[in-house]
Amino acid sequence: VQEVIVQNVVPNERSSFEKPSVETMRRTVAMARVALPESVSVQVPPNLSPTRELLDCGVDDLGGVSPVTDDYINPDYAWPALAELVDVADCAGVPLYERLPVYDRYLPERFRRPGFDGDAAPGSWLADPIVDALDADDAHGERFRGVARRDGPLDVSAGD
């Protein structure tokens, strides 16, 4: 398990329940952080949750957000603007950068970012077609490798 997403329920016209309180979300995020190994990230979706109010409970990942696409799972809830995400990340000390859907520890060593100081997951975690895409000698492979190194085009970190 590389991450656990603590996603609140957002009621709609077909539901009869209420959105959980901020305090309930804070307790849930904190319990996830305590219960999970340190190597497992705790994520909250910033378009569905009061992210700023949850960061100090153990959130270390803001999720797969996009400045150019909608949230396909929750299309009624737009992603926060990139500037807002930068501000939220800065306030929490959580780096904001473009990343692959797989965390560094699961990447083969040759694809990990320089300075990776975590514990590599044992074994092989990526299917051959994914490794082939990362290895590709074309613009796509180059882009994937750049994102893995954290020097992708959407790098907005301040020196991570």
Could you tell me what each predicted segment is?
Residues 1-160:
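Auxiliary Fe-S-binding modules of radical SAM enzymes
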